[in-house]
Design a protein with these regions (language model features):
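Non-catalytic, usually N-terminal nucleic-acid engagement modules in DNA/RNA processing proteins
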Residues: 1-75
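Catalytic cores of enzyme domains
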Residues: 68-254
Length: 254
């Protein structure tokens, strides 16, 4: 059964796939999967190679590569879920690679309903590096994950036991926000302020100032390039301006 599922996934052009039993999925911050999908028993975790776009200093090109993956990933997720439902008469739900996220004062939009990193580790697709990202045995850190949760009972794939991180500290040295200074923790707010400069924080500041400004100043504000960038980032859903921790990691790039 697992081989049939994996053959289907790989036939879509997905780079790798792993399977994890829900009991082996351990995420310290994300909610219990049973609250999302009562009766959930397994996760089918899909892995996608990040394109070389991430190396570009042109952030439009870099982000364009990520958007390409996200579009393909959503389509693949849907097709895998439908395959499971059709072939095995089971229920399946998709877990997106990013947004939508639960927005609350507690999580501040930084905690996913499913931790795809922990799901990937549980599915044998790698282990954590110093940058707190998952390192895949072949693709290194340049990998994006999605998942499909099902009530089909499947055993977990063997874990990746080899330590893949070389502790070179290049990721820490290349983080302009110093979000990785404390080992074992990513300072989400420092990271987001730098990597998403036109995210929700900037939008709040812009619209607060806009509301408090006279009409003539408001006209100037909406004609300013800062507003244009906010508009574009909002239209995309989010827009990264930093891929340093991912692209600087040497593992898998030899």
């Amino acid at each position: 059964m697992k081989d049939k599922i994996k053959d289907f996934v790989l036939g879509l052009g997905v780079d790798n796939v792993g399977i994890a039993a829900v009991k082996d999925y351990k995420s310290p911050r994300s909610p219990d999967l049973q609250g999302i999908f009562p009766g959930a028993k397994s996760l089918v975790v899909l892995a996608y190679q990040e394109l070389s776009n991430c190396e570009s200093e042109n952030m439009q090109i870099a982000m364009g590569g990520r958007l390409d993956i996200l579009e393909f990933a959503r389509s693949s997720n849907y097709r895998v879920a439908r395959f499971l439902e059709r072939e095995f008469k089971t229920k399946a739900i998709t877990v997106p690679p990013s947004y939508p996220l639960h927005m609350s004062y507690e999580t501040r939009g930084t905690v996913g309903d499913v931790s795809l990193r922990h799901a990937a580790v549980a599915a044998g697709l790698g282990n954590f590096g110093r940058h707190n990202l998952v390192i895949h045995p072949k693709m290194g850190t340049r990998v994006v994950f999605t998942a499909v949760i099902t009530n089909l009972e499947l055993p977990s794939d063997p874990p990746t036991t080899e330590k893949l991180c070389t502790d070179c500290n290049i990721c820490v040295e290349n983080c302009p926000a110093h979000a990785l200074d404390e080992e074992g923790k990513t300072d989400d707010m420092k990271c987001l302020k730098n990597s998403q400069p036109y995210g929700i924080g900037s939008a709040i500041r812009f619209w607060t100032k806009f509301a408090e400004s006279p009409t003539e100043e408001q006209k100037k504000m909406v004609k300013d390039v800062n507003f244009w960038r906010l508009y574009q980032a909002g239209s995309i859903g989010f827009q990264y301006f930093c891929f340093n921790c991912m692209k600087s990691c040497p593992v898998g790039q030899e």
